[in-house]
Regions:
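Short, compositionally biased leader-like segments
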Residues: 144, 148-164, 276-277, 281-284
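A conserved catalytic-core signature of glycosyltransferases
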Residues: 25, 180-182, 212, 221
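Flexible glycine/acidic-rich beta-alpha junction loops that bind and position SAM and/or redox cofactors
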Residues: 84, 127-132, 152-168, 205-209
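Radical SAM/AdoMet-radical enzyme domain recognition
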Residues: 1-146, 150-154
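Flexible, active-site-proximal loop/turn residues at the rims of small-molecule/cofactor binding pockets
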Residues: 27, 80, 157, 206-208, ...
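Glycine-centered positions within short beta-strands or beta-hairpins
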Residues: 190-192, 196-198
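Flexible mid-to-C-terminal extensions adjoining Fe-S/redox cofactors in radical SAM and related proteins
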Residues: 198-199, 204-284
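Structured beta-strand/loop patches that form or line metal/cofactor-binding pockets in enzymes
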Residues: 167-184, 188-189
Length: 284
């Protein structure tokens, strides 16, 4: 997404109150070479700038520029509790190496402390085998303690419903996730039919993006989309339980209170990072 287009959308949302802008959606924010400029836009409108990332490129001057721009929260996705498991789940020839990611985290933690930044450096981990939770959890906790970061450790998820995760599948009562009713909007860079700024109900549609477009910010303002026909149709589907295809297999609909296995900071299962609302308030 171009910087001027991004600022247009941020300014539009800011009219209605803006607490947090997550700069990644379901993509990789560090693909943008001028990412610090996007962070500055978020700060200009009084919101917090959050990024969830694989962390491959978050090093050196690029990392320092992001922190200095006012980044509030950066989360490294770190799947695999040791080098062997990390290589299985996260390996990438460009930067997905266990030792490299550890160095990137350590470097960022050190710079945040050195610069006096309030940026929170965090990691995100998944239990890859529900039959081996205790052992994996202890290995993750040791890693987190060594790195000196905040963390959250979750059971395996299948939010888009696009994969068969076997024995790791969640189990529980199915009801609306609450997201279509919540004050959270997801704006993508691209769109349909050469439009841009596609609006999705959440970032978990993963791979089913074309099915889940509720409007385009290049064509309408965010209020018209949020209160528009497509959004209201989705809300009614969530009220009745007649979920659309891009929702009905998503395991975010499943009530599983044990899905958040461990956290060492204020991370509530039903509250998205930095937001004030509770999704439970929108699930009844």
């Amino acid at each position: 997404m171009k910087l001027d287009e991004f600022e247009k959308y941020v300014a539009d949302c800011a009219q209605y109150g803006l607490n947090v802008v997550n700069l990644d959606g379901s993509g990789e924010a560090t693909m943008a070479k001028n990412l610090p400029e996007y962070i500055k836009v978020v700060k200009k409108y009084g919101a917090k700038a959050f990024i969830f990332s694989n962390g491959f490129k978050m090093e050196g001057q690029y990392m320092r520029d992001c922190v200095d721009a006012g980044l509030d929260f950066y989360r490294f996705s770190f799947i695999g509790s040791d080098e062997q498991d990390y290589s299985k789940w996260m390996y990438n020839a460009v930067g997905g190496h266990y030792a490299q990611i550890r160095r990137n985290i350590e470097e960022m933690v050190a710079y945040v402390k050195e610069s006096g930044s309030d940026c929170v450096v965090s990691t995100y981990h998944l239990i890859t085998d529900n039959n081996n939770i205790d052992e994996e959890l202890e290995k993750y906790k040791t890693l987190v303690d060594e790195l000196g970061v905040k963390t959250e450790i979750w059971k395996m998820h299948n939010w888009s419903g696009a994969w068969d995760i076997g024995d790791n599948a969640r189990k529980g009562k199915i009801k609306t996730c609450g997201r279509p009713f919540s004050p959270d909007v997801v704006i993508r860079a691209g769109g349909l039919d050469k439009k841009t700024g596609a609006v999705h109900p959440c970032c978990q549609v993963l791979g089913r993006d074309e099915e889940a477009v509720l409007g385009h910010c290049s064509e309408d303002n965010i209020a018209d989309i949020f209160f528009g026909e497509e959004y209201e149709t989705l809300r009614e589907q969530h009220r009745t339980g007649d979920y659309p295809d891009f929702c009905k297999s998503c395991d975010f609909l499943i009530e599983d209170p044990e899905v958040l296995v461990y956290t060492n900071h204020e991370r509530d299962l039903m509250k998205m990072h930095g937001t004030k609302f509770d999704l439970n308030d929108y699930r009844d």
